[in-house]
Amino acid sequence: MRTHFCGLIDETLIGHTVTLAGWTDVARNLGGVCFIDLRDHEGIVQVTVDSRAIDQNNSELFKVASGLSYEDVLQVEGVVCARHAVNDKIKTGKVEVIATKIKILNKAAPLPFHAHENPGEDIRLKYRYLDLRRPEMQRMQRTRIKLVQALRRHLDMHGFQDIETPILTKATPEGARDFLVPARMHPGEFYALPQSPQLFKQILMVAGFDRYYQIARCFRDEALRADRQLEFTQLDMEFAFVSERDVQDFVEEMIRRVFKEVAGIELDTTFPRMTWTEAMRRFGSDKPDLRINLELIDVAALVADSTFTPFTDAVAHPNGRVAALRIPSGAVLSRKQIDEYAAYTAKYGATGLAYAKLAPIGEITSPIAKFFSEDAFAALLSHIGAEKGDIVFFGAGNYNKVSDFMGALRLKAGKDFALITADWRPLWVTDFPMFEWDEEAQRYVALHHPFTAPAAIDDIDELRAHARTALSRGYDMVLNGNEIGGGSIRIHRPEMQRAVFELLGITEDEARAKFGFLLDALNYGAPPHGGIAFGIDRIAALIAGTESIRDVIPFPKTTGAQCLMTDAPSSISEEQLSEIHVITKKPTP
């Protein structure tokens, strides 16, 4: 049907007859000469039909060309010629195709939007097949395709085995909410769609496969946002007989190589490492964006003698924190804007946001200055490094809560004051706490997942005695404030796994019912093993330069968890429900 792609026609083909196929991007009738921009997945080439040529066929061609509409599907035969007016904006701009035949393969109905428009997201998702024709969307999808291909090449080259794991599996409700599938042949029982292949890949290590990977589809029934979908894709990896450093060194090299191959992006030769504690202290986040040159500064020692109750209460509390954030040139903020920052931090748990504004010329404006002696307040600002023209914000209260809202403030200030540099800043965050205490549930929860090994603790009694302070062998790869990969060294001894389940409030009977197959596998000579999973959607979005992963997923769901193109989810007939032994119940208002 075609001999060449539109976007690959060049000067080497001048004088040759070619057959092309594609869509009508633009059709222009300029007084007897018709110009058609014919588009396929490789690009655009200009097709010319001149009614003034001494050829009966040309007048017929001109009639066809004159009647074309946007997105009509064509087959064109013609001769490649040098173009008189070169178009440097397209790669085929030095040539054109003088048409000798045009066949309309399919007429397009009037479009809800044109390929060169950028309509609202709902209409784009409803007509996703039209949205994906847009050059920008084609570019982003190709970025994703190249990313996956490059990852596969690298892993295949290093002896990893691509092994599929089940999509219909057992519900293990320890993370997000599962998607459940009724088991028709087992009335009243359900499969679950996998939130990750975590347990299967560990069992593959027990089975002796040594190096595993999979481009895995994962499913989590959770609230959606710009960087989260109900179904998503991850590069899942696992290694036998490795330490944390073995895993990190390998995937660091892989990510450096893939970023350069896919997008020409040069990442640091060695990624810096930062403990979870340091990341929270300096940046108020376990996924710090190092492009923003702002840090939180602990000032508890300098405010302890003040009479400002929020500060002194935080200093007196064993888990309290008083932190400051200096924003260079931030004194331009009005009182209204400062109040907006306070309202913003309130979303993250702040009960107030103190400040000190150092005018370029004049006095310091601060509602908390009266609670300090003049020398003490000057010493506080000096310790922070505040200069004329700056503003300093203060947060006080529970350590984790202060870290969270001051970290959020740091990110917002970085954006608002254009402090984010245009580079790539990867790092490893390590030494996460093994557990978090859930006040509401009155029990420990795993910070990573229940299968992560504790660090520097081999004795079960020691783990029980130091559960609050125990660190895990977990690690995250962070890039520009995004967690792009997370992994750990796993528990490979069944008695340690049982102890962790116990600390998480999972009884022996529950552990056997939910994870008995894993505990059994660990009994039969499980090797030390570890791994990592990378978010393909998130990495593709970063490389493509978009803030929403929906742009790099061919058929994403809306934030309302719907597919507007197929109208999913949809109702099911009573007959189908009966076959799978399910009765639906609408929620009460």
UniProtKB/Swiss-Prot annotation:
Record-listed ATP binding positions: 220-222, 229, 483, 535-538
Predominant subcellular localization, coarse grouping: cytoplasm
EC number: 6.1.1.12
One GO BP annotation of this record: aspartyl-tRNA aminoacylation
Annotated localization: Cytoplasm
Stretch list, region Aspartate: 198-201
GO cellular component, one term: cytoplasm
Binding positions (L-aspartate): 174, 220, 448, 490
Disulfide cysteine pairs (residue numbers): none
Oligomeric and partner information: Homodimer.
InterPro entries in alphabetical order: Aa-tRNA-synt_II, aa-tRNA-synth_II, aa-tRNA-synth_II/BPL/LPL, Asp-tRNA-ligase_1, Asp-tRNA-ligase_1_N, Asp/Asn-tRNA-synth_IIb, AspRS_core, GAD-like_sf
Superkingdom to which the source organism belongs: Bacteria
Official protein name in the record: Aspartate--tRNA ligase
Record bears the keyword Nucleotide-binding: yes
Catalytic activity: tRNA(Asp) + L-aspartate + ATP = L-aspartyl-tRNA(Asp) + AMP + diphosphate
PROSITE patterns with a match to the protein in the record: AA_TRNA_LIGASE_II (PS50862)
Protein family per UniProt: Belongs to the class-II aminoacyl-tRNA synthetase family. Type 1 subfamily.
Gene3D superfamilies: Bira Bifunctional Protein, Domain 2, GAD-like domain, Nucleic acid-binding proteins
Transmembrane segments: none
Keywords: Aminoacyl-tRNA synthetase, ATP-binding, Cytoplasm, Ligase, Nucleotide-binding, Protein biosynthesis
GO MF terms, alphabetically ordered: aspartate-tRNA ligase activity; ATP binding; nucleic acid binding
Role summary: Catalyzes the attachment of L-aspartate to tRNA(Asp) in a two-step reaction: L-aspartate is first activated by ATP to form Asp-AMP and then transferred to the acceptor end of tRNA(Asp).
UniProt organism field: Xylella fastidiosa (strain 9a5c)
